[in-house]
């Protein structure tokens, strides 16, 4: 644990007790968070009342120590560096890294200047506002040295010594190499400075006590660049570096525990809810009706759609826009790495499965004559026709292949119906109107239920669709 000597000295000054081994090491804390199965109940042994007192004092000491170890020194400010010291090659490399990391996606407020911060990010602990990444000396990072920038990316510590919250995914960025961090720093420092004071992040107690993040980091942060896997190919390692490092895919696609840390193991990339959208599993646990192949993953990440799964909408739309500016080899490496978590289906097998699903949906049409079908025909038929994917305006994937219809959660489908698609990942994908003002919650629920029954007949009906439609209507997304 960083600052062990300082903690021990502080405890000695306060209590007169000298600890040779602090009682709050990461192993001890992990053991407390994950206790072993309880043994059979035994009659309690009588202890002196002082044991409870000692436990209370120890708990207090741990809390104080957490605050002590959270104090980090500030890095001295520097005069804004002359941008001409960086080569065009370095700056372009930094631009690509910023695109892979979607820096502008999170650090740009709606209608604001790129990277000037201020976007509100809802978390279970409160709203986090993204910071100004432009080289403005007063409100941005203009006074940040490279060492300050590196510390923030590797350790989650701001230039002034304050802890950053893991809504800024430094647990992934810590894996970025020194050379790439320097290139990213060079790119950011050569962008136009924007004076923009962002709102202050205030989280509920105790999450708003930033020094306590030192304990969180001791448990969940593994600082330093990630090593390569010698047993894997160069392409696989490049993909792993981009996905798990600057791309921080797990920040959205892995579920988090009760204190906001990404879960690994079988839950790695296993899907999660982010900003009201479902970020689906990127592994073989995916609810997609057609297995993802390496080619389909590349097509989706590069162009924002695949004929066997659907289109990138919601938060993935801006991600695809950024990935489209990367070298094709990098996107292929990401697809290659992600494909290693999928079932081994060939492109021919995937195509055959897709055709079966489309044919099944067409034959079920006559069996489902109902008011909901008439609602679908009037609201959706102009573009989607009979759900068979005939293109009217832009790309149109058969609804029987749309992954959202096979999910356990109706949220993504309901959001698209209510909010439409006003900013597609690419212009060729086309737009979709919003039905927020033309359909009420009951109609939205009937429409979603019909689409689930017809186009994903093997899946159980969604429950409480009207309540879900009302909830989503009242909580619009920021993407």
Write out the residue ranges for each language-model feature:
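Short extracytoplasmic
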Residues: 86-121
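C-terminal structural cap/anchor segments
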Residues: 371-409
């Amino acid at each position: 644990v960083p600052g062990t000597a300082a903690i021990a000295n502080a405890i000695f000054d306060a209590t007169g007790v000298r600890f040779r081994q602090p009682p709050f090491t990461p192993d001890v804390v992990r053991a407390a968070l994950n206790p072993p199965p309880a043994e059979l109940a035994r009659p309690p042994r009588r202890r002196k009342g002082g044991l409870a007192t000692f436990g209370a004092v120890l708990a207090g000491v741990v809390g104080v120590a957490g605050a002590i170890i959270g104090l980090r020194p500030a890095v001295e400010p520097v005069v804004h560096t002359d941008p001409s010291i960086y080569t065009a090659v370095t700056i372009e490399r930094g631009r690509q890294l910023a695109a892979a990391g979607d820096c502008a996606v999170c650090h740009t407020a709606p209608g604001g200047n790129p990277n000037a911060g201020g976007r509100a990010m809802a978390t279970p602990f409160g709203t986090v506002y993204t910071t100004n990444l432009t080289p403005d000396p007063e409100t941005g990072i203009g006074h940040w040295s490279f060492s300050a920038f590196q510390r923030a990316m590797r350790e989650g510590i701001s230039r002034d010594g304050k802890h950053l919250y893991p809504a800024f995914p430094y647990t992934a960025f810590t894996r970025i190499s020194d050379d790439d961090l320097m290139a990213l720093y060079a790119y950011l420092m050569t962008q136009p400075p924007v004076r923009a004071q962002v709102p202050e992040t205030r989280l509920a107690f105790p999450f708003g006590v930033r020094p306590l993040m030192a304990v969180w980091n001791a448990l969940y942060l593994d600082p330093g660049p990630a090593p390569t896997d010698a047993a894997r190919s160069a392409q696989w390692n490049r993909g792993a570096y981009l996905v798990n490092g600057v791309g921080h895919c797990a920040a959205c696609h892995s579920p988090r525990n009760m204190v906001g840390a990404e879960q690994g193991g079988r839950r790695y990339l296993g899907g999660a809810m982010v900003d009201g959208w479902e970020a689906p599993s990127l592994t073989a646990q995916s609810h997609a009706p057609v297995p993802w192949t390496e080619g389909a993953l590349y097509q989706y990440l590069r162009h924002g759609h695949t004929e066997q799964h659907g289109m990138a909408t919601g938060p993935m739309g801006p991600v695809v826009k950024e990935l489209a500016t990367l070298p094709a080899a990098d996107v292929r490496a990401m697809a290659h790495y992600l494909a290693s978590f999928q079932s081994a289906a060939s492109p021919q097998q995937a195509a055959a499965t897709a055709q079966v699903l489309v044919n099944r949906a067409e034959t079920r049409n006559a069996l489902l004559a109902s008011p909901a079908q008439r609602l679908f025909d009037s609201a959706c038929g102009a573009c989607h026709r009979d759900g068979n994917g005939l293109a009217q305006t832009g790309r149109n994937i058969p609804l029987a292949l749309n992954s959202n219809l096979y999910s356990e959660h109706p949220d993504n489908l309901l959001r698209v119906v209510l909010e439409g698609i006003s900013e597609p990942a690419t212009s060729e994908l086309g737009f979709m109107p919003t039905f927020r003002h033309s359909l009420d919650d009951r109609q939205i629920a009937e429409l979603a239920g019909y689409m689930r029954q017809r186009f994903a007949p093997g899946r159980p009906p969604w429950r409480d669709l009207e309540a879900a439609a009302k909830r989503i209507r009242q909580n619009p997304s920021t993407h």
